[in-house]
Structures are given as structure tokens and as C-alpha cells.
From Swiss-Prot:
The keyword Thylakoid applies. Signal peptide: none annotated. It comes from the Bacteria. PSII is composed of 1 copy each of membrane proteins PsbA, PsbB, PsbC, PsbD, PsbE, PsbF, PsbH, PsbI, PsbJ, PsbK, PsbL, PsbM, PsbT, PsbX, PsbY, PsbZ, Psb30/Ycf12, peripheral proteins PsbO, CyanoQ (PsbQ), PsbU, PsbV and a large number of cofactors. It forms dimeric complexes. It comes from Synechocystis sp. (strain ATCC 27184 / PCC 6803 / Kazusa). This is Photosystem II reaction center protein J. The modification N-formylmethionine is found at M1. One of its GO terms (cellular component) is photosystem II. One of the components of the core complex of photosystem II (PSII), possibly involved in regulating electron flow. PSII is a light-driven water:plastoquinone oxidoreductase that uses light energy to abstract electrons from H(2)O, generating O(2) and a proton gradient subsequently used for ATP formation. It consists of a core antenna complex that captures photons, and an electron transfer chain that converts photonic excitation into a charge separation. Pfam families: PsbJ. It is a single-pass membrane protein. Disruption phenotype: Grows about half as well as wild-type photoautotrophically, assembles about 50% PSII. Electron flow is deregulated; forward flow from Q(A) to plastoquinone is slower while reduction of the oxygen evolving complex is faster.
Length: 39
């Protein structure tokens, strides 16, 4: 699966994209929940 023991670039991009979306989603969800509970 791995080319010369290195991870393919597209795999890194997919993992990074999912991670970034997950972090941003949790951040915005936390901010929205915090604002909603404070009002």
C-alpha cells in the first residue's frame, strides 16, 4: 500500500482535512452552545 514506506500525499490531505473540519466543527459548536447557555 505504501510507496517506499511513505504515506501517500492524498492520504495526508484527507486526514488533515477531516481533522481540521472536526476541530472547527467542535469549536463552533462549543462557541454556539456557550453563547446559547449564557443568554
Amino acid at each position: 500500500m505504501f510507496a517506499e514506506g511513505r504515506i501517500p500525499l492524498w492520504v495526508v490531505g484527507v486526514v488533515a482535512g477531516i481533522g481540521a473540519i472536526g476541530v472547527l466543527g467542535l469549536f463552533f459548536y462549543g462557541a454556539y452552545a456557550g453563547l446559547g447557555s449564557s443568554m
